[in-house]
Amino acid sequence: MRHSCLDAFNSYVARYDASDERIALKVEHTYEVAELCDEIARGEGLPPADVDLAWLCGLLHDIGRFEQLCQWGTFSDADSCSHAALGIQVLKDEMGSFTNDPEWVHIIESAVALHSDFRLPAGLSDREGLFCTITRDADKVDILRVFNQSSCDAVLGIDSSEFSRGEISDMAFEAFGERRCLARDERPGSLDGLVGAVCLAFELELPATRKALGDRGYLQALLREPFGLSPHFESELTQYRWNAICDVMQGLAFDSRPGIESEDPHKRLMNRLDCSEAELNSEAYVDGGIFLDSLLERYDA
């Protein structure tokens, strides 16, 4: 089954400009997410047929990206259309090349349609929710891979000197304290995209996903040396905030000890600081309107 699906996927992608690096990056992302879906499904103890279905959800989750790039020249949904919705349109013509099983078609369409939503909607069946969650979890893990393998300029739109002068906004730091992903309008600071990537780990829902991320070391590497740079910042407030973020993540990420999940994350975070933020001279934050532009171009993260 997988060989025929890979052949169908590669035949579909061959219609687009293979010399465009963005196509190659999206193909790589697709393969990575599909394999992560397989790994997560196996780790959660799903039967072989469901593991194959999870893998296929991963293979097709970004099928709309190629036509999006062809029509609009961008991977940014804000500057074109919803790539998830476009993927559903593509699959109306292409789904038969991958499966004709009505139940599989329904699950795949749900996973594709909802993989990039900020939250899953109420009303999904348990089975729909499971495959949507596997797909979303796998996508988040691979976004962290992208952060590890990309430059600061490519991801945040700032060079290394600007990185050292960067700011973490109140809004992003508060979202981190709440242990949740950042919405697109919660990223005004030049380093908020980096904080947003770290926050992806908070919303990995399945134990097998957290294990997959831990095994790959993407988060640890990002905390230790983001974009291959030393995380030393000119702003004292930024440095305190980054140190607090690192300390909390090292203490909480993938920690299964009883009581960890119930601890107030903001209290824990603030307890990590050597002094309160009120004692620091908080200046105006950098307007980071261009931060993450390149990442949005690739993944609309």
Describe the role of every protein-language-model region:
Residues 32-40, 81-95:
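An active-site-proximal "capping" alpha-helix that borders the catalytic cofactor pocket
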Residues 29, 52, 79-83, 130:
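Secondary-structure capping and boundary motifs in well-ordered enzyme cores
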Residues 21-27, 31, 35, 39-47, ...:
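Divalent metal-dependent phosphate-bond-processing catalytic cores, especially two-metal-ion Mg2+/Mn2+ enzymes
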Residues 23, 73-81, 94, 98-102:
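Short gly/ser-rich anion-binding loops that grip negatively charged ligand groups
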Residues 70-85, 153-157:
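Post-HEXXH active-site segment of zinc metalloproteases
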Residues 6-32, 65-77:
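Active-site flanking loop/helix segments enriched in acidic
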Residues 51-76, 87, 107-118, 301:
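His-Asp-centered metal-binding catalytic motifs of divalent-metal-dependent phosphohydrolases/nucleases
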Residues 45-56, 96-113, 127-134:
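Acidic/histidine metal-binding catalytic segments
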